[in-house]
Every structure is written in structure tokens, then in C-alpha cells.
């Protein structure tokens, strides 16, 4: 008999009850570790106390990402987005707040006071904050299926250094 675990556990096929017990207890231990760890929302709440603007986390050594930051700054007349490199201490803390590993530089992240967005969702959310016509473009792009948007995003993100190069340090 095979038991299929839900997708959130990574589609494992389990062939015996002993394996099920091991998996459940391992999962329970992970929850305990998370509960006892630092509350990163509280730890980073100071980032949003005086300034409620969202923070765009980006790869500080990626030329494509630096170009994206420059583009957003040029098209954000209201200065509604703040920027932080993923490699900075503040960036690492905000990654932890978002439920991501502190060394994960695989995606742009948009951190709002109560929510975080990654990959194509982050890009669309950023587009909603900047000047016309980008909010309207984001509205239409949101109807493309998430798996298609993220597939395209991941293909560019995984090849960004090869296509656009990298710099020695963050330009901001």
C-alpha cells in the first residue's frame, strides 16, 4: 500500500506505517523549532514603524537586478518603495521575516508591513506601486497563470549572471 503525502510535503510515496510515523514526528519537530525561534516579524517591525512604504529586496551584485532597481526608482515619482540588498544584514532579517533562508538570493522579494511577495507576484506588486502605465500592465498580467509567470521568472533568474553579468559590490 502506498500513501501519497500532500504537495506541501513534496509528494513522497510512503510504503510502510513506520515510515509514516517517522515522517510525522520529523514534521512535528520542525514545527517546534520554528515556534521556539526568533519572531522575525517583531524583530523587523522597526523597519515599518515610521516608514510604512514596502521594501524591495534585490540581489545587490546582479546587474539585471540593479538595472531593475534603477528602473523602479526612475518610474516611482512618489518614492513609494524602499530598497535593500538581499546580502545586507537588514535584507537577511527581512528574508527571515518572509519565511525564506537568509542566504536565499534566488528571487526579488517585496516586503510589506503584513505580507511578502516573491518571484512574479513581487514584480507585479512592484508594478502597481510605480507610475503609469505599469499598474495597468500589472492588472492584465495577473490573469496569466502563476505557474507560467513563475516559470518565466525562474528561467531569467537562474540565468541572470550569465546573461547580464554581476558586479563586485552593490551599487546602492
From Swiss-Prot:
Residues 1-25 form a transit peptide. GO terms for molecular function: protein-disulfide reductase activity. Keywords: Chloroplast, Plastid, Transit peptide. The keyword Chloroplast applies. It is found in: Plastid, Chloroplast. Its main location: plastid. One of its GO terms (cellular component) is plastoglobule. It holds the Pfam family DCC1-like. Signal peptide: none annotated. Belongs to the DCC thiol-disulfide oxidoreductase family. This is DCC family protein At1g52590, chloroplastic. It comes from Arabidopsis thaliana (Mouse-ear cress).
Amino acid at each position: 500500500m502506498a500513501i501519497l503525502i500532500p504537495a506541501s510535503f513534496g509528494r513522497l510515496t510512503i510504503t510502510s506505517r513506520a515510515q509514516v510515523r517517522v515522517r510525522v514526528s520529523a514534521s512535528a519537530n520542525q514545527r517546534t523549532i520554528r515556534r521556539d525561534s526568533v519572531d522575525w516579524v517583531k524583530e523587523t517591525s522597526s523597519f515599518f514603524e515610521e516608514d510604512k512604504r514596502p521594501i524591495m529586496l534585490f540581489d545587490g551584485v546582479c546587474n539585471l537586478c540593479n538595472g531593475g532597481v534603477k528602473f523602479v526608482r526612475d518610474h516611482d515619482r512618489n518614492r513609494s518603495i524602499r530598497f535593500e540588498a538581499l546580502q545586507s544584514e537588514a535584507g537577511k532579517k527581512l528574508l527571515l521575516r518572509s519565511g525564506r533562508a537568509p542566504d536565499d538570493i534566488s528571487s526579488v522579494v517585496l516586503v510589506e508591513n503584513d505580507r511578502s511577495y516573491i518571484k512574479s507576484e513581487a514584480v507585479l506588486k512592484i508594478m502597481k506601486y510605480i507610475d503609469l502605465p505599469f499598474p495597468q500592465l500589472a492588472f492584465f498580467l495577473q490573469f496569466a497563470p502563476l505557474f507560467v509567470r513563475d516559470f518565466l521568472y525562474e528561467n531569467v533568474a537562474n540565468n541572470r549572471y550569465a546573461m547580464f553579468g554581476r558586479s563586485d559590490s552593490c551599487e546602492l
